[in-house]
């Protein structure tokens, strides 16, 4: 099922929020999962991908 651009932006916003929560909780496993999802959603939207050097995602 394909998602609309608006739905993808909404998912990106929620994923960033989840990433920030995981970072505060110092949960590196969840941080990596959300960082990968953020980069995937950004690629889908055609915007610059965020870099996460502390997670080796550049």
Q: Predicted regions span which residues?
A:
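A ubiquitous short alpha-helical element
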Residues: 1-5
């Amino acid at each position: 099922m394909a998602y609309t651009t608006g739905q993808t932006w909404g998912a990106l916003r929620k994923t960033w929020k989840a990433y920030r929560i995981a970072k505060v909780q110092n949960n590196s496993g969840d941080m990596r999962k959300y960082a990968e999802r953020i980069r995937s959603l950004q690629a889908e939207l055609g915007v610059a991908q965020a870099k996460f050097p502390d997670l080796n995602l550049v």
